[in-house]
Amino acid sequence: MESGSTAKTGDFFYGWDLLYKTVKADVSKKSDLLIALVHFLLTKHYNFRCVGVGDDKTLPEEEGSELLPDSWNDDDTKYSLRYVHDKMLYLLLGHITEGSLLINLLDINTKKVSNICVEPETLVPEVKGGITTIMPSASEIVERYRRELLDPVFTGNSREVTTQTTNSPRPIGSDPDPLRIGEPRRGGSFIPSAFEPRPFGFPDVGRGDLDPLGRGGHGNLFSFPSRPNMGPGPVPRFDPFNPLNPNRPGQGGINPDHMRPPDWNPDYYM
């Protein structure tokens, strides 16, 4: 839908004269022209197509027409027109009561409905002539139709822009891999998903033992302070890499007891 300033230009009403010529012989009351103006707005600027009269809520198979159907204004007090847009059905209903015309637009799918009340006697001084003669304030009427009747139910332009944005091509390789679990880890320690990283602030001692691929360090295989040089590389703490040296403290050999065993007094006890 064009903006309000565009609606006031002659280009906006281009095509109205053709529509008016097809219905002017049938126009019998001023409210007919107000309904015809809604029809023009729907078909010319919102790409609706009329599929007949009535209030049947069944979506028809035909594509519809830009022209008003036969018998569209046969009833003296009401109007019922059916439209389709993008395979969705809409009903345009009008009721004449106490000199006013109440118009409703109903979206059959979403059940959204809008309404507007206009005064035919005030807005339509003549039923014959050009658009500026029969409806001098046609631009203002169109703006009211758009704001009060169409926008609450149908936002065609906004919907099209959203669809184009959603369907815009994505760069190659941007599609997610359904078999991929999380991002790959680049170096550092391996922490299974069920473990909290460093829960008590301790270093990552033993974390490497949890990694079946051997990433993230040596795990529990490290040198003790009491055995600083146990051989090349990390060694198991429970199985020293080299033979025991009895002359080095802390690596086996005879170590006298500090307390005398009962009833035992060997010569070497000190």
Curated annotation (Swiss-Prot):
Pfam families: PI31_Prot_N (PF11566). In testis, expressed in germline stem cells and primary spermatocytes (at protein level). Residues 177-186 have a biased composition (Basic and acidic residues). Keywords: ADP-ribosylation, Cytoplasm, Developmental protein, Phosphoprotein, Proteasome. Disruption phenotype: Larval lethal. Mutant larvae develop melanotic tumors. Residues 158-169 have a biased composition (Polar residues). InterPro entries: PI31-like, PI31_Prot_N. A motif (HbYX motif) lies at residues 268-270. Residues 158-270 are annotated as: Disordered. GO terms for biological process: male gonad development; male meiotic nuclear division; positive regulation of proteasomal ubiquitin-dependent protein catabolic process; proteasome-mediated ubiquitin-dependent protein catabolic process; regulation of proteasome assembly; ubiquitin-dependent protein catabolic process. The keyword Protein transport does not apply. One of its GO terms (molecular function) is endopeptidase inhibitor activity. GO terms for cellular component: cytoplasm; proteasome complex; sperm individualization complex. Changing L210A: Abolishes interaction with Tnks, PSMD5 and PSMD9. ADP-ribosylation by Tnks increases its affinity for assembly chaperones PSMD9 and PMSD5, sequestering them away from the proteasome Rpt base subunits and promoting in this way 26S proteasome assembly. Also interferes with its inhibitory effect on 20S proteasome. The keyword Transmembrane does not apply. It is found in: Cytoplasm. The modification Phosphoserine is found at S168, S189. PANTHER family: PROTEASOME INHIBITOR (PTHR13266), PROTEASOME INHIBITOR PI31 SUBUNIT (PTHR13266:SF1). Belongs to the proteasome inhibitor PI31 family. Plays an important role in the control of proteasome function. Inhibits the hydrolysis of protein and peptide substrates by the 20S proteasome. Enhances 26S proteasome function by promoting its assembly through the interaction with the assembly chaperones PSMD9 and PMSD5. Functions together with ntc to control non-apoptotic caspase activation during sperm individualization. In testis, is required for proper protein degradation and germline cell cycle progression. The Hydrophobic-Tyrosine-X (HbYX) motif is involved in proteasome activation. Interacts with ntc. Interacts with Tnks (via ANK repeats). Interacts with 20S proteasome subunits Prosalpha1, Prosalpha3, Prosalpha4 and Prosalpha6, but not with Prosalpha2 and Prosalpha5. The interaction with Prosalpha4 is reduced by PI31 ADP-ribosylation. Interacts with the 19S assembly chaperones PSMD5 and PSMD9; these interactions are increased by PI31 ADP-ribosylation. This is Proteasome inhibitor PI31 subunit.
